Amino acid sequence: MYDKIKILTFAKGNFIESQQKLKNHLVSIGLTNQKHITDKDLPESFLSEYSEILSFKKGYGYCIWKPFIILEELKSIGDDEILLYIDSTDLPEKIFFDEVLKNFEQREYFFLNRGYNHGQWTKRDTFVLMDCDNQKYYNHVQLEAGVIGLKKNNFNIELVEEWLEYAKNKNILTEHPNISNLPNVNNFVEHRYDQSILTNLFIKKNLVSHRFGTEVIKYNYNQPKIY
């Protein structure tokens, strides 16, 4: 049933235990086509090119590795395969994967959200430097970048390439103070780095997302977050 889905995960430090738990959970559901990456698997060329950003402990370089590993794997899969990236700290129920398959009967991508406002969780520079500085973006729902499904096609490859390219700019990706001299949006809480960038691109391209709660995608972590 799930033979067209290829799972991709990443873990470092204390997250490796969660990755193993997710792996076992997925096998029990029937998802056996899996690739699990750790920081030890990242190529030297990546570590060298992104060494400055990777030096930030939060998200192990604000999760810049995420668009990188997704892009590499997306290019390598077969044309009829679905690449489904899942954060190691997420534990989706079987019903979730059934919904993913239904989605791919109509679309060649899958994004989800949890109902949070994008403007509250994105610093102003990320809007400004991506030419997204208006109410359309502030008021939109933010994606949950912990689960991303993509079929191999030029549109999706170019989307992830853009995501990675914007992530190279630390003024867009990181929590560095805004250089635009503009205040954050009202009710701003915190910047969501890779997720904020992906959401801007998602809105710009007029894509569609699905809302899921913790009853369908459970939290898979009970230790201090140490990368």
Where are these regions (language model features)?
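Glycosyltransferase catalytic domains, chiefly GT-A lineage
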Residues: 1-227
